[in-house]
From Swiss-Prot:
Subcellular location: Cytoplasm
Biological process, per Gene Ontology: tyrosyl-tRNA aminoacylation
Name of the protein in question: Tyrosine--tRNA ligase
Entry function: Catalyzes the attachment of tyrosine to tRNA(Tyr) in a two-step reaction: tyrosine is first activated by ATP to form Tyr-AMP and then transferred to the acceptor end of tRNA(Tyr).
Protein species of origin: Burkholderia pseudomallei (strain K96243)
Length: 413
């Protein structure tokens, strides 16, 4: 079927359609092709038939962080406009491993890892999406039955030259870095998902653009109306430099405790705060612009950071949790010890300070403990520890690492 708008009857672009298009475009990096999507929206409004909106996520890790919610928020906005959202769990494509943005082959996950991670994926995503209006699918439904014959036929629809147009593949090829054949299959399988689901729009991060376009091309080859493409920006992590990633430690998990989530959000820079407002807040753009004007006019940016942190904590927990998190944050800022810190009993006194911090669960390793001591970030009963060779005697005390990690330690011989 041709996707040339001139070959199909044009549907009227009403105020309702213009509003839906404006909602769709908020905060996006790119919408391809906007004129086509406007017609899809117009047709949907005229025929009262919802669009099929696809988002695929590979369960490569068990937890979803705020970076993932940028695209989930957009899905919810489209859902609220009345469209069908398809939350696609890439249990088959996870066996391949997405090479997007990689400079080396990504190790595929085992079936056991995938199944374990997938269990918690939608439960967390449902904190953003409307569970009752979400279609949950697994791409193994249609990918596994393909078999060798079907896979060969699918592979014949795309050339190696086209695959090498992708920037990360090009860099690896030119740099003599190996590219495995199975990595070429990933964009094809993701694209085939769009054929199987007959998607009208597919969402993804900016690093997914090539894969999304493969889906559009395959739909054309299979005689379907081509999906439009919507890419969302990658959210910077707490450091404001690299994209949010659990492996980089610069993330905020959506299942974290309210106090931890609030504290992490309050740690971001004033500049990064506005980026988070744009991509994570449900407030109107006009309201955010007004906040920014007030900050530029002299109002303390901390006021707006508190609003942002409370909004996000309330979304994933409750308004009461957000209020308590603010109280806890203010208490800590004044040098107070939180009421809900964990109690830990350790043995082996006198115990090296690095071991104590690790065994108390305050740091992942002794080397991390020593780094925190060097930076003046470790306190025992409020006194800063400066001696990395310190041996801690038996007793009861409160240990603090950084601004947010506390433990009430009982150390015995």
């Amino acid at each position: 079927m041709s996707t040339d708008p001139t070959s199909k009857p044009a549907f009227p672009i009403t105020d309702e359609v213009r509003h839906a298009l404006a909602v769709t475009k908020r905060g996006v990096d790119e919408l391809l092709i906007e004129e086509e999507f406007a017609q899809k929206l117009a047709k949907s409004a005229a025929t009262d038939k919802p669009l099929r909106i696809k988002l695929g996520l590979d369960p490569t890790a068990p937890d979803i962080h705020l970076g993932h919610t940028v695209v989930l928020n957009k899905m919810r906005q489209l859902q609220d406009l009345g469209h069908t959202v398809i939350f696609l769990i890439g249990d088959f494509t996870s066996l391949i491993g997405d090479p997007s943005g990689r400079n080396a082959t990504r190790p595929p996950l085992t079936r056991e890892q995938i199944e374990s991670n997938a269990k918690t994926y939608f439960e967390q995503a449902a904190l953003v999406l409307d569970r009752e209006k979400t279609e949950i699918r697994y791409n193994s439904e249609w990918s596994m039955p393909l078999g060798a014959d079907g896979m060969i036929k699918l592979a014949s629809r795309y050339t190696v030259a086209r695959m090498l147009e992708r920037e990360d593949f090009t860099k690896r090829f030119q740099g003599g870095i190996p590219i495995s054949i199975h990595e070429f299959l990933y964009p094809l399988m993701q694209g085939y998902d769009s054929v199987a689901l007959n998607a009208d729009l597919e969402l993804g991060g900016t690093d997914q653009k090539f894969n999304l376009l493969v889906g559009r091309e395959l739909q054309k080859q299979y005689g379907q109306e081509q999906q439009c493409i919507l890419t969302m920006p990658l959210l910077e992590g707490l450091d404001g430099v690299e994209k949010m990633s659990k492996s980089k430690g610069n993330y905020v998990g959506i299942s974290e405790k309210p106090t931890d989530m609030f504290g992490k959000l309050m740690s971001i820079s004033d500049v990064l705060m506005w980026r988070y407002f744009e991509l994570l807040s449900f407030r109107s753009l006009d309201e955010i612009a007004r906040f920014r004007g007030e900050a530029e006019g002299g109002r303390n940016p901390r006021d707006f950071k508190v609003m942002l942190a409370q909004e996000i904590v309330a979304r994933f927990h409750s308004q009461a949790d957000a209020e308590r998190a603010l109280e806890d944050f203010n208490h800590r800022a004044k040098g107070g010890v939180p009421d809900d810190i964990p109690a830990v009993t350790l043995a082996g006194a006198p115990l090296a300070i690095g071991q104590l911090l690790k065994q108390a669960g305050l740091v992942p390793s002794t080397s991390e403990a020593l780094r925190n001591i060097e930076q003046g970030g470790v306190k025992i009963d409020g006194a800063t520890v400066s001696d990395k060779a310190l041996k801690v005697d038996a007793g009861e005390f409160v240990v603090q690492v950084g601004k947010r990690r506390f433990a009430r330690v009982t150390l015995t011989a």
